Amino acid sequence: MKQYDVKISHAALSDMEQIYSYIADRLLEPDTAMGQYNRIAEAIQSLNILPERCALVESEPERTQGLRQMLVDNYSVFYTVGEDAVSVARVLYSASDLVRRLRRMK
């Protein structure tokens, strides 16, 4: 079975740090924050095998560009699949206006 390199953008890393900080500092739940961070990180690393298992996003032009969405608890991991690598673009809270936030990242 083919294995892909998983590359995480600076924006996605920043998203994960902000998720951790919000839960740990605003909600005062550092253990929960670490658990959430670890679940997201593990899910991202799992994209090294069968990254096509997650659906393409429904909005255009993101769908045509091959952007996929993986749900992890209340968060969405957005990524593309290349020939040998998976590129994680963003990790966003799923209840937010995802299309608007994705388009701002360009």
PLM segments and residue spans:
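Basic side chains
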Residues: 7, 39, 53, 68, ...
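Alpha-helix boundary/capping detector
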Residues: 38-49, 66-73, 96-97, 105
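Basic, Lys/Arg-enriched alpha-helical interface segments
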Residues: 1-63
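Enriched for short, Lys/Arg-rich terminal
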Residues: 27, 72-76, 80-106
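Basic/aromatic recognition patch in beta-strand/loop cores that engages polyanionic ligands
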Residues: 50, 54-85
